[in-house]
Amino acid sequence: MNINFARQGFAWRSLAMPAVLVLTMLSSHVLAACPTDAAIDAYVADFAAKRISKGFGNDISAVDAECAKKKLSIKLRKVLGQPVGYKAGFTNVALQQRFNVDGPRWGYMYDRDMIDILAVVPAEFGARPLYEADFIVVAKDAGLADAKTPLEALGHIEFLVPFIELPDLMLEGTFSGNAMVATNVAFRGGVLGMEIPVVKSQAFLDALANMTVVMTDENSGKELGRAKGSALMDNPINAAMWLAQDLKKNGIALKRGDLLSLGGYVPPQPTKTGMRVQVKYIGLPGDPAVSVEFN
């Protein structure tokens, strides 16, 4: 991070500032700091061991959370494999309010624990394992970041993919949104459904906003949650556009095949042994679905 200290209006008498002010400024500087490499390594060790972690502090600032995430993105490769895309978090207003963040954030996704279609995974796949109804778009090219309208954006998307994210909220106690961002927005893995071809039409765009995402316990038939497609920034394609644009602002150009996870439709829920969860996207062609079983 480059910080430019303005020198306009500087007066030599400012060197004689009160000691209390000096101490206050120093104190603030100490508190506001990107986590050290040692702290990053400690978190990665906790992550690899699937144990609860103290993370990087609940009071971490948004700037320092981004710094931690960037450092962590390199170290997580030895546990999670190669980068495969990016995940948006807090695209749902309810989750923004729950974690007291002022807008969406994003993290990195990796390939090692991304599983296709009908998946059986350990219920204890992490320190605090959860499942979440999500949705993925597959980028066609970097032009997604420059699209001016959702309809134009569809032309830069290869496929849509039903997705159950398997996040790991492994921080101890309660935690802030910034603390979660610092840990790469809790990404660990997920289950991918069948690819849905994109139709560049207003009708298809409307179907994405109007679809109903339903999460069900397949063993009992109990509904676990539902939301309209519009729960993610009025249309999931808006979430894809936001993510592509924010990545570009951070010097990241999308490439063909990058996965973009768009955020949770309903709050994440804890896994249970023997449970089988289905997420269905009612209103899209064929009402596509994706399932996962926990053993």
Question: Where do the protein language model's features map onto the residues?
Answer:
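Short, charged beta-turn/beta-strand-edge "cap" motif at the junction between a beta-strand
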Residues: V266-Q269, G283-G286
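Short, exposed beta-strand-loop hairpins at the edges of beta-sheets
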Residues: N184, Q278-G283
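N-terminal secretory signal peptides that target proteins for export/translocation
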Residues: M1-W12
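N-terminal signal peptide c-region/cleavage motif recognized by signal peptidases
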Residues: S27-H29
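Hydrophobic helical h-region of N-terminal Sec-dependent signal peptides
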Residues: M17-M25
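Catalytic-core "active-site belt" of small-molecule-metabolizing enzymes
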Residues: A33-D234, P288-S291, N295
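C-terminal soluble interaction/assembly domains
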Residues: N250-L254, L260-S261
